[in-house]
């Protein structure tokens, strides 16, 4: 037995292998009318991943994404300016997000349930967020994930020892921080944006405002760093005529630019002296406390809501020196004015006041409940039916929220249950493959299967499968094409057309239709001998061999005429050749007459549109052909016959060849980044499409019991019943899908029956000739010699003919019954079930014949009518006195 820990589960698989398992194991268990919840059709992707790669945002809800980007911008500014948080392990620069290798500030309150999942299929920042969420507290994960609590919902209030400021409003902070075209300056926090090659007007005005507080010695370096002179010329500003800076706090028109200097430039440039009522200020902290208090006076109560311990007073003491350099302490107290002491944490509180100011003039973000963050109540999850539960657990990462020591944590739901914890809510993260959520792909695939009744594919016009030559003429033309040497394109076309016309003139007989198996070879030989560039590509799509033949340049009547004229043919002569070779040219220009293959998305990679310089039409002729794969090529015969144990049988993928091709097609679709459910459906092999849920059979095999389980159907479609019979004989091995296998087996028996009825007809005709000669002799005796042959002699002869036909039909039935049993036993043997001890009785033969009879009923009726015709003909010629004494009775 395989150890339980070594079993590969769906959450350990990725890309095509994962999608294949979903399609082959989960999809067959869903009803075709199964409705996927709209909330599960989108997923969560960390905004950092989307900002670096816009295509990743296609699987998210746009309103949730915009809300998360706004919230994340606020949280990032709070975190990067704080002295104690430092939860983000990234640095946002112009056009890039750099990962910090130093450990982030994860709390000591780590998750007691150890996470063993890596989530390698997720984008890097989403993967990192999940690792943090399953390691640290849920509250911290929500902070660095941009979570916004929905209003009026049953979302959970997570528990945490310490909580951070929660601000919520529309903003473009992240976009501004990541704006690519900025001046490369030593100060990374202030990003001077370049618009149309010039410093933006807003940044220019702010820099001019800051510039007035920079000392004269540092001002040239400042101007050079930010190209102030160029921007001033562009905006028509004369730097030499700027007004002198106002450096007195009592008369400053605004404190904005002095605060900006403190926020961004204090450590790079020297500041001019600042005064209060003519006295020089001595301490920078007092300058900032005064400026911030005056500029953000209305926001101080809001600040206290977040930081109740911050000192707030009705006055402020400023330490200054008067013009005589004497120390003067000034106590400033203004009516209805409060002064806040930011405790020398200038950078954080300046940033936080700016956030509060932005919040005051912006609208709050409204979001709905998130399946990733808020999820659903655990009781609601448990109440879902088995089908929903199976679908969710196979297409989503399933997490659970639980409380431990007054702290909320998140872990894989199965890990929580294994740890004997009680989940409170269940959160879902739908997986993404090829740029789409798996849940959405399954929904599209189910819709495609439900809406398409037949597997359509572009096919050739079957009415044009000849070139107007008889079989003899076609073979001569075919041999001539094989002898054509390499010649210039124009010359080769002319010689082939003229050779065809020559053969056509003396050809007699009905047109020979090209066989399907030789069609592609003839196409290749015909166009290659004419000098066209012919390329062939072959692949497998579904359970069909796909052949793509491209012919360049494109074949049209006008192109042939133009080419013939290049070989010294006049236009009139070229038209005559075209007329004489009408059937050939009609065949050539009609080879690609099928439904537009470009409407089938999944075949575009096989049939790309090309454009070649020098080609009159600018494209080529495409021939697309599809042929079903034979059953022996579809199944893994080597794997089946090499399996000797039950485990080996269970591990054998019977349809390995076509499943491998299916995986390759899935990989190609995923790599394209534009996979759809229709792609999956059209690439799906028959063994998955036709799969039904079956149960294993009993421990022994009884031919009679198997045949008793089969019922006759009016439509002669025995596939489902025989599939049930076969699956009932598989003992304890894994249930396998035999729909297509049984269907082909029955068709094989039916074809064999046609051949057998032909042999029987020939034998019957030869034997009937003896009876005919006997009847002729009786006729001669009575007509010529006027002797009378008794009715008992005539009746005896007719009875013997009836016995002959009955014996012939009985032999035919036994033969067909044996053929049918042989086909079914062959399938059972392939399925891994032992049939050595099975005994076949006469009753089994009768049952076997009854099963196949609906498929060969027309042939049986034909034979009976033929025999009846002989019987009635002989009876008429015998001229019996009592004609009703003998009659021909059939089934």
From Swiss-Prot:
The record marks 614-615, 697-698 as: Cleavage. Pfam families: Pox_P4A. Coiled coil: none annotated. It comes from the Viruses. The keyword Cell inner membrane does not apply. The keyword Lyase does not apply. The precursor is cleaved by OPG083 to give rise to the 62 kDa mature protein during virion maturation. Proteolytic cleavage of major core proteins OPG136, OPG129, and OPG098, which occurs at a late stage of core formation, is required for production of infectious mature virions (MV). GO terms for cellular component: virion component. Belongs to the orthopxvirus protein OPG136 family. Interacts with P39/A4. Core protein 4a is the most abundant virion protein. Major component of the virion core that undergoes proteolytic processing during the immature virion (IV) to mature virion (MV) transition. This is Major core protein OPG136 precursor.
């Amino acid at each position: 037995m395989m150890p339980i820990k070594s079993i590969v589960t769906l959450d350990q698989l990725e890309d095509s292998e994962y999608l294949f398992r979903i399609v082959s194991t989960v999809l067959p268990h869903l009803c075709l009318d199964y409705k996927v919840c709209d909330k599960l059709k989108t997923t969560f992707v960390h905004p950092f991943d989307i900002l670096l790669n816009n295509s990743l945002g296609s699987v998210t809800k746009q309103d949730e994404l915009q809300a998360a980007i706004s919230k994340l911008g606020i949280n990032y500014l709070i975190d990067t300016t704080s002295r104690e948080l430092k939860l983000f392990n990234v640095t946002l620069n112009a056009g890039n997000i750099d990962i910090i290798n130093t450990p982030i500030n994860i709390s000591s309150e780590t998750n007691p349930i150890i996470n063993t999942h890596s989530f390698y299929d997720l984008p890097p920042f989403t993967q990192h967020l999940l690792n943090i969420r399953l390691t640290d507290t849920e509250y911290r994960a929500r902070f660095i994930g941009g979570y916004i609590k929905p209003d009026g919902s049953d979302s959970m209030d997570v528990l945490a020892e310490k909580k951070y400021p929660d601000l919520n409003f529309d903003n473009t902070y992240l976009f501004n921080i990541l704006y690519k075209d900025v001046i490369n300056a030593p100060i990374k926090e202030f990003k001077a944006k370049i618009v149309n090659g010039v410093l933006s007007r807003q940044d220019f005005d702010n820099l001019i405002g800051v510039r007035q507080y920079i000392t004269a010695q540092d001002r040239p370096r400042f101007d050079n760093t930010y190209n102030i002179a160029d921007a001033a010329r562009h905006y028509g500003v004369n730097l030499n005529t700027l007004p002198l800076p106002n450096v007195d706090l009592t008369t400053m028109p605004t404190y904005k630019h002095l605060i900006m200097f403190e926020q961004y430039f204090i450590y790079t440039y020297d500041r001019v002296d600042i005064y209060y009522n003519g006295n020089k200020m001595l301490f920078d902290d007092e300058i900032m406390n005064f400026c911030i208090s005056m500029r953000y006076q209305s926001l101080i109560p809001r600040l206290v809501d977040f930081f109740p311990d911050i000192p707030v007073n009705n006055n402020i003491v400023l330490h200054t020196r008067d013009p005589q350099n004497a120390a003067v302490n000034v106590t400033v107290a203004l009516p209805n004015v409060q002064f806040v002491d930011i405790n020398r944490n200038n950078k954080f509180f300046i940033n936080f006041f700016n956030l509060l100011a932005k919040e005051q003039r912006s609208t709050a973000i409204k979001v709905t409940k998130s399946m990733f963050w808020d999820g659903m109540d655990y009781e609601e999850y448990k109440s879902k039916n088995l089908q929903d539960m199976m679908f969710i657990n196979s297409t989503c990462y399933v997490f659970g929220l639980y409380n431990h020591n007054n702290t909320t944590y998140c872990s894989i739901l199965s890990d929580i249950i294994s740890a004997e914890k009680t989940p409170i809510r269940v959160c879902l993260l739908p997986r993404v493959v090829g740029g789409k959520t798996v849940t959405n792909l399954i929904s599209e695939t189910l819709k495609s299967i439900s809406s398409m009744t037949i597997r359509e594919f572009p096919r050739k016009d079957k009415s044009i499968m000849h070139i107007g030559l008889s079989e003899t003429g076609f073979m001569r033309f075919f041999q001539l094409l094989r002898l054509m040497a390499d010649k210039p394109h124009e010359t080769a076309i002319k010689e082939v057309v003229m050779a065809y016309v020559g053969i056509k003139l003396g050809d007699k007989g009905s047109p020979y239709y090209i066989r399907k198996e030789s069609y592609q070879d003839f196409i290749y030989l015909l166009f290659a001998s004419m000098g066209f560039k012919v390329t062939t590509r072959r692949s497998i799509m579904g359970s069909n061999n796909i052949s793509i033949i491209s012919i360049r340049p494109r074949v049209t009547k006008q192109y042939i005429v133009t080419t013939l004229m290049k070989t010294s043919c006049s236009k009139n002569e070229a038209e005559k050749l075209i007329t004489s070779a009408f059937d050939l040219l009609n065949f050539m220009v009609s080879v690609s007459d099928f439904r537009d293959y470009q409407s089938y998305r999944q075949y575009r990679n096989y049939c790309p549109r090309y454009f070649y310089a020098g080609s009159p039409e600018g494209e080529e002729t495409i021939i697309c052909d599809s042929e079903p794969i034979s059953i022996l090529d579809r199944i893994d015969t080597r794997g089946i016959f090499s399996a000797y144990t039950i485990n080996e049988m269970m591990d054998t993928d019977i349809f390995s060849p076509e499943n491998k091709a299916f995986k390759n097609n899935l990989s190609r679709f995923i790599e394209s980044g534009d996979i759809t459910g229709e792609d999956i459906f059209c690439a799906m092999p028959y063994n998955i499409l036709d799969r039904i849920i079956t149960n294993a059979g009993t421990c022994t095999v009884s031919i009679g019991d198997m045949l008793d389980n089969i019922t006759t159907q009016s439509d002669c479609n025995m596939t489902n019943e025989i599939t049930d019979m076969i699956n009932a004989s598989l003992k304890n091995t894994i249930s396998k899908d035999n729909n297509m296998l049984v269907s082909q087996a029955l068709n094989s028996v039916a074809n064999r029956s046609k051949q057998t009825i032909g042999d029987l007809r020939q034998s019957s005709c030869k034997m009937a000739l003896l009876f005919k000669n006997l009847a002729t002799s009786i006729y001669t005796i009575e007509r010529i010699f006027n002797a009378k042959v008794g009715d008992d002699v005539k009746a005896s002869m007719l009875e013997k003919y009836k016995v002959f036909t009955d014996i012939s039909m009985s032999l035919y039935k036994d033969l067909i019954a044996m053929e049918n049993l042989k086909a079914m036993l062959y399938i059972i043997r392939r399925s891994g079930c032992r049939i050595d001890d099975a005994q076949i009785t006469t009753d089994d033969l009768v049952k076997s014949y009854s099963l196949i009879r609906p498929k060969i009923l027309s042939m049986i009726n034909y034979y009976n009518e033929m025999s009846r015709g002989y019987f009635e003909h002989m009876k008429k010629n015998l001229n019996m006195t009592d004609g009703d004494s003998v009659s021909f009775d059939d089934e």
